[in-house]
Amino acid sequence: MDQIIVRGNGPLKGEIPITGAKNACLALMPATLLTDQPLTLTNAPRLSDIRTMTALLQSLGAEVASLQDGQVLALSSHDLTSHRADYDIVRKMRASILVLGPMLARDGHAVVSLPGGCAIGARPVDLHLRALEAMGADLDLREGYVHAKAPSGGLRGAVIDFPLVSVGATENALMAATLARGTTVINNAAREPEIVDLAECLRRMGAQIEGEGTSTITVEGVQALGGATHPVVTDRIELGTYMLAPAICGGEVECLGGRIDLVAAFCEKLDEAGIEVVETGRGLKVSRKNGRVRAVDVVTEPFPGFPTDLQAQMMALLCTAEGTSVLEEKIFENRFMHAPELARMGARIEVHGGHATVHGVEKLRGAPVMATDLRASVSLILAGLAAEGETIVSRVYHLDRGYEKVVRKLRGVGADIERIKEVADG
């Protein structure tokens, strides 16, 4: 298993290119199942989750070609050979459930494995299923699979009232609604930029959609969708992560392709902490000149609030802030697993349920730490950039799911970082 070694060595300076959003791309790829015409995605990220979605689509008979070193994906679902998404692939990635709505809408039937780790009665996937049932789908859950059939004549437009905001369920309902008969209204829809990006792509394919980016989306179903070429939106989580690198270490870094509207709530917190963010026309320039950052309080919320996927990285910054910060996690449970690892580096953090209190210290010290998930892994790397001495991060395979060339990008702005093969004991 690989490890990443980070040595704190002062301010960073330079440029970091930001790639297309993984979470957007994972929703855009299944949109190929809505049409028999080619769909081309540009600015695609090169990540393990993208390869998993590629394998899933190919198992259904879709063609997926990776061009220009993986930055362009050419997809075609002209002749599907299967409508069954097997557990062996679906268990690797929850986004696999996004093939359900498109297959059901276009061909009237689908069999999709439930994602791994779903506890009965509290499954996030229930919101996806409720939306499709509202559109007339007949769903039968047996042996770990959803067996779905559309009514004769296809899915029907419906009013869908989500009791909770769900990005994935909004995406599934949105794609299914494009080919449903009549009008579909999605209430309490997710407002994330990835939803807006999906709607823009579907509109390029011929869909009639209004209201994306608000909590109510209206879709007028059409008979068929065509092909399109669509650029994947910038990854706002990767953007925020790399913006934190100079915030933690000092220096000045320009994140190419960055946009304020994607990270507005995050930028407000950086401003409170004393970090300067400037739009340049090519991206966002982030700088921290002198002294410690100020403590700030953070509450994670659905977009346009502070994103839960930047909470761990923000905690790394606040570990050395002047004063005490409180982070409240309102999206996911058990999202503070990085806190004990940061404590190994000298951070003073108290966790009580969904709250973490961070008492800023002057300096972190390098230590061996273990990544527990994708965002935790990068938060430990960021902390290591500003720590005294050497930090060794184990279990970094999580990184490959969400960050492309993280070592190369950080090294390009002056970080002392390398990835090595872990040496086994004995």
UniProtKB/Swiss-Prot annotation:
CDD domains: UdpNAET (cd01555)
Pathway assigned in UniProt: Cell wall biogenesis; peptidoglycan biosynthesis
Signal peptide: none
Catalytic activity: phosphoenolpyruvate + UDP-N-acetyl-alpha-D-glucosamine = UDP-N-acetyl-3-O-(1-carboxyvinyl)-alpha-D-glucosamine + phosphate
SUPFAM superfamilies found in the cross-reference section: EPT/RTPC-like
Keyword terms: Cell cycle, Cell division, Cell shape, Cell wall biogenesis/degradation, Cytoplasm, Peptidoglycan synthesis, Pyruvate, Transferase
Residues the entry annotates as binding UDP-N-acetyl-alpha-D-glucosamine: 94, 123-127, 309, 331
Any one cellular-component term (Gene Ontology): cytoplasm
Keyword Ion transport belongs to the record: no
Residues that bear 2-(S-cysteinyl)pyruvic acid O-phosphothioketal: 118
EC number(s) given by UniProt: 2.5.1.7
Positions with a binding annotation for phosphoenolpyruvate: 22-23
Residue positions of the active site: 118 (proton donor)
Subcellular location: Cytoplasm
GO BP: cell division; cell wall organization; peptidoglycan biosynthetic process; regulation of cell shape; UDP-N-acetylgalactosamine biosynthetic process
GO MF terms held by the record: UDP-N-acetylglucosamine 1-carboxyvinyltransferase activity
PANTHER family the UniProt entry points to: UDP-N-ACETYLGLUCOSAMINE 1-CARBOXYVINYLTRANSFERASE
Family to which this protein belongs: Belongs to the EPSP synthase family. MurA subfamily.
Functional summary from the UniProt entry: Cell wall formation. Adds enolpyruvyl to UDP-N-acetylglucosamine.
Record-given protein name: UDP-N-acetylglucosamine 1-carboxyvinyltransferase
